């Protein structure tokens, strides 16, 4: 299976989220940050174990570390050929530089996020629309070969090049959602309902009443950022209420790093094979993705994604 866009990979999830489907049948697709190519493989292996779709997210920092947008995109294409049974999307996360985002589209990313949430409403609309128009028409995979996520409202916390103090956060205003989506033409909307980037000092207080109002305003995918540290029961409630994409970054870094540290402690000093050091990290990531697939009710949903893809415009 080729790389999919977020619109394609979440068609079935969004259908269930925006109709009177039984809340127990709804599910969200997990979106996970990576910093290295072995982590990319671990993400896909975890999804394969659960027959689930998955979204691989690269920050600009991760892209710089790996080498380039083109290198990341080529790695994703190779992984897609190696694991054809796993539907997945390559996503550029929280990008603010318009030219970098457009370069990612041309390089072969199948979803990009324009984060203009710290701008005023009209500027956010203008930038998000510019990226949506470009992405929908300039992907190497053809028309609609790249989809777009934007953010309305601001999460507190630190996400590499985006930093918002707790005092500066702003919840998503439901009254602005329909206008924002209609005027921009985006495919997924990241909402601010009480989560934050990074680890929490205390459990977040998610405003479920706000999520309910936002869900009524649009029929595109809703995205929950700041998934690290959110209690399992809150995840389940978000999914039941119509969240279609859930982002996890910081927590996954800890899972990987803890496994690598443990491997280093247990290996003899005469062992120099780096695969025995980073290999446990890759396995730990796969196990975490398998667990999150169950939590998000996404396990076993790969066939539904394949069916949903047929209802979207085919890519060249």
Each predicted region: which residue ranges?
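Alpha/beta enzyme core
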Residues: 7-24, 35-62, 69-85, 89, ...
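Terminal or standalone catalytic/regulatory effector modules within metabolic enzymes
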Residues: 26-28
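Thr-Gly-centered strand-to-loop micro-motif
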Residues: 224-226
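Active-site gating loops and adjacent loop-to-helix segments of metal-dependent hydrolytic enzymes
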Residues: 263-274
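His/Asp/Glu-rich mid-to-C-terminal helical/loop segments that flank catalytic regions of hydrolases
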Residues: 283-299
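Residue-level detector of conserved catalytic or cofactor/ligand-binding positions
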Residues: 306-316
